[in-house]
Amino acid sequence: MYKKILLAVDGSVHSERSTDHAIQLGKLTTEAEVEIIYVLDFSKSKSEVLHSGSAEALEQARRQKLKKIEGKFQTEGFSYKLTMKHGDPGPTIVSYANDNHFDLVIVGSRGLNSFQEMVLGSISHKVAKRVDCPVLIVK
């Protein structure tokens, strides 16, 4: 069974659904560890910095995005580790997962249609193609 699970989140509804699956899988074994990774996208974080009043306000806004996700773990009494990184989410998640030898990566999917995915690409698709372990994509 999976002992070392990486849950990639962005604070969206899709991340909340993937959180439920991470908790369910984590409960299947007593040795399971779930680590949440939240990657601050450079292009979005520049905008956040410009529109926030202070560093404290910016940090508060980022933590607010993760509040529901962390709340799910706390409600279930399931311990977790939270890691925040800066960069392009796809490659950052892949590097972190591969460098830290996770058994499973769980990521939510926005449900892009085939044209959107071809033009834009998706983080879940990038992760699934490049990470060295199994990937669970939650719709």
Q: What is the meaning of each model-derived region?
A:
Residues 4, 96-139:
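Gly/Ser-rich helix-loop-strand patches that form or flank binding pockets
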Residues 53-64:
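A short acidic, glycine-rich active-site loop
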Residues 3-49:
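Small/aliphatic-rich secondary-structure junction motif
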